Amino acid sequence: MMSGVMLLMLAIFLIIAFTLMYLAIYFEFDETTFTKRLQVMTEYVKRTNADEPTPDVIGYVSDIMQNTYIVTWFNTVDLSTYHESVHDDRIEIFDFLNQKFQPVDRIVHDRVRANDENPNEFILSGDKADVTMKCPAYFNFDYAQLKCVPVPPCDNKSAGLYPMDERLLDTLVLNQHLDKDYSTNAHLYHPTFYLRCFANGAHAVEECPDNYTFDAETGQCKVNELCENRPDGYILSYFPSNLLVNQFMQCVNGRHVVGECPANKIFDRNLMSCVEAHPCAFNGAGHTYITADIGDTQYFKCLNNNESQLITCINRIRNSDNQYECSGDSRCIDLPNGTGQHVFKHVDDDISYNSGQLVCDNFEVISDIECDQSNVFENALFMDKFRLNMQFPTEVFDGTACVPATADNVNFLRSTFAIENIPNHYGIDMQTSMLGTTEMVKQLVSKDLSLNNDAIFAQWLLYARDKDAIGLNPFTGEPIDCFGDNLYDVFDARRANICNDSGTSVLKTLNFGDGEFLNVLSSTLTGKDEDYRQFCAISYENGQKIVENEHFQRRILTNILQSDVCADLYTTLYQKYTTLNSKYTTTPLQYNHTLVKRPKNIEIYGANTRLKNATIPKNAATIPPVFNPFENQPNNRQNDSILPLFNPFQTTDAVWYSEPGGDDDHWVVAPPTAPPPPPEPEPEPEPEPEPEPELPSPLILDNKDLFYSCHYSVPFFKLTSCHAENDVIIDALNELRNNVKVDADCELAKDLSHVLNAYAYVGNGIGCRSAYDGDAIVVKKEAVPSHVYANLNTQSNDGVKYNRWLHVKNGQYMACPEELYDNNEFKCNIESDKLYYLDNLQEDSIV
């Protein structure tokens, strides 16, 4: 008994296990799927196995649902599913042979194209040859939509009224596109429906009024015959819109004709008879009528029973109450009969383009397309200060619609256009110094992401200096000599023109030589600086580098001369802090040229100088004569001649020598050399000895550094760094810097003391300047500020920092060379052996 139960349970278990295994295998892998994948792999192998081995995984399109399709990837070893993914055929297409997805644009471009010879056809590129496909009748292929679309009803038709045939009724009234032959009834038209085509290709289906039939030959609605079976003289209650106030319609010989009342009578449409009265007498205010002596666009409107007003319209129509009224749009008045299209065109000095289109029908506006003409460069600022003086639109009209404006659909009338710079602190107008080229605009609107807009702007500029001109006419691009009362080029500031008040002729041409520069704030355009040698001149030939070189610095190492600020300051300091050994008194304030190099053009004669070593000692027993005629003279042994004591033709070296505390300036003359010995045999060449190091300069004041801050080729500021090569002066500088005197109102600007003659406007009408007053370095409040600035942080009126040696932080002001300035600690690491002096070349020279 137990054995039978066990056998039954075992049988049930086996049946369940077999069923589960079967279902698992069935759902996991059915025979149909196996067959499909086997066919897919077989097809793939046949077409590709000659080129490459069978891959481990193959994908194929397994399901399609409208635009969505599924790509199934399976293992080629056992045909089991590897992966599935969902895709959109509007975005990408699966390439079976290459086992890759390709963008739709590329597929369409490669596989589908329109047939230029027949708009009803399109061409498919097959694997072996092209295949021409046809759209249904009255359909054309639209490549943009990649499908066949109905031919517009007004295709190739001018504006006007057209009869409705069977095909038009099917498509426009019944809204059905049937693929059938309409040639059998091609001559039949609907009696009252007609097609109105507009100038822009649009259409409308309209119907004639009651008692009217559309005449296909004339293209107008004509009234039906109203006098059929009516006697002659029968007056009709039919009043066409062009019927005058004294006219009526009557029947004659079975046809309706216009009848007319006797003179001085009107036809009363209420009484249906001619009466002798004013047209307004029976109808009152608001009644309208027309007479033979007014125009086609005019009518009379009754003000009361005996007065009327003449109304002039753009277009006269009659409303549903049989009263005249005005209609139409004034914009259509220039079109013939108020019907047609007008393409608007924008033209200025630089470009021209179509900006829109107006379509009218019977003086009514059907379509008014206005493209977006807002300037794409309206808010564009190049290099933070330049604007294009050109109105380049956002959109243009291409004949059918507004499209984005490009270099291809905008016509350039000139090769150059004006460039404007935003207002600046110095009032510099650069529109005559450079012009933009049309290639710049083409590059800017092409949306080339490989270059930024500033780089494109700088690359396509035309400079006045390129044409060897002081300026270019912003409107014609031709060289000019005047543009207002003066003309200069900030990119080539070697010259300038001063013109008459009308700006028509040159009064004076300035060529700036050594010691002169262009001062844009001066009426004379000339500034003076003895050290300046056109150091700010731009040497670049690359146009892009020229405009990018807005702010730069020139450094020049030169000598301290007796006439410059270094000599004045250091001489004063030296004489103040130097004392005589015997009396410990301050040396007299006398400048004697002992501190600096002798100017090149000052001659020193031997009779007025004494050698330091020739000074007579106080304890000398005897005083030797300056010149002893009996002293043994050197002679020339070769010719037994006596050499002169002074030979003006003798070659000698002289050193201009000076020493602190000396009595005067001295020439130290090298003693005459003996005659050269007889030539000896040339010795063997020896290695060249190393050059001896240069001896240090014997001068206390030797070198100075000049730093010019340039705005393009115009110098704005000059920083002089005076080298101190004497311990007395170095100690004096340190003492002065440790004992700076500051006015109370200039406490915020106390750090101007690092650089003499530095100026800062601290607001509230207070201007502070650093100076050396002969006793101490002071930061003093000026009685009247030299300059007042709107922006205290930049010390300018346009928010641009021009003075690179003046620093502002948290309301405090400091003058310091850039390389010595510590912005984090607001500190100037000033050098103990240098004195700095700042010149504002543009502003201070005109104060």
Curated annotation (Swiss-Prot):
Glycans are attached at residues 156, 211, 306, 337, 500, 592, 613, 639. Residues 1-19 form the signal peptide. Coiled coil: none annotated. Keywords: Chitin-binding, Disulfide bond, Glycoprotein, Metal-binding, Repeat, Signal, Virion, Zinc, Zinc-finger. The keyword Disulfide bond applies. Disulfide bonds join 208-221, 261-274. It is found in: Virion. Residues 665-698 are annotated as: Disordered. The keyword DNA damage does not apply. A zinc finger (C2HC BV-type) spans 148-197. Pfam families: Baculo_VP91_N (PF08475), CBM_14 (PF01607). InterPro entries: BaculoV_Vp91_N, Chitin-bd_dom, Chitin-bd_dom_sf, Chitin_bind-dev_reg. One of its GO terms (cellular component) is virion component. Residues 681-693 have a biased composition (Acidic residues). PANTHER family: CHITIN BINDING PERITROPHIN-A, CHITIN-BINDING TYPE-2 DOMAIN-CONTAINING PROTEIN-RELATED. This is Capsid-associated protein AC83. The gene is p95.
